[in-house]
């Protein structure tokens, strides 16, 4: 760098998001690299980032805050810029699990075929494929995880019972707030061919076990202690917790993300 300026040259296979950082920055500034001349300016601290000469960055930086605003329509963005990788990125990164599956698929279908090789689109397609397998009416995919004693337990072991798969973690405040409600549901229905399997996204065994004890969670608990790197949340399309699924005795998903009073109402209807 000389007098606050530098240049670099190269090519990329396709536009992707990269980080640009200085020693003064706590976190890299994000921008897309594409095969066009670009002029980038920002402070040493990473503030006031601007990029000239890049249509992808025009869309990316121009919507960096808008995507979080109430009323933002990702469908409108994709419809207007179907061949822009930044639109595909925003759909994948922020709306994959916010949109109902049918709406997600409809918006995905509006992306230009030229973006099919984008890793954002490929990851989005993989997520859609997983979500299609865990919709209401589908048989929940089997899995095995260690319990609190380190013994491998499979979902198939519970076939014949109504099962609530409860995704949570000891570090998750909303999960901990919901736990008393789940405890109440368990105590009221545990003698009605109903049980709960807690699947934790913890990565610390001691904190996991302490959370179970502190919240009086007396049902089966499983975790590979891999945090979000666990394969099971991905298998079930879980990207935020708390999350749950209610399975019938045949392992068919009959309800999803039922919390607070909705949990009790659903169980009363199903277990009557």
Q: In which residue ranges do the predicted regions lie?
A:
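Thiol/disulfide oxidoreductase modules built on the thioredoxin-like
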Residues: 217, 224-270
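Conserved helix-turn-beta segment immediately C-terminal to the redox Cys motif
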Residues: 177-199, 269-272
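Conserved redox-active cysteine motifs that mediate thiol-disulfide chemistry
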Residues: 159-160, 167-184
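N-terminal targeting signals for export/organelle localization
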Residues: 38-40, 49-51, 57, 68-139
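Thiol-based oxidoreductase modules, predominantly thioredoxin-like and allied folds used
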Residues: 192-206, 217-228
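N-terminal "domain-start" segment that seeds a small globular fold
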Residues: 122-155, 219-220, 266-268, 272
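A non-transmembrane, solvent-exposed segment enriched in polar/low-complexity residues
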Residues: 1-80
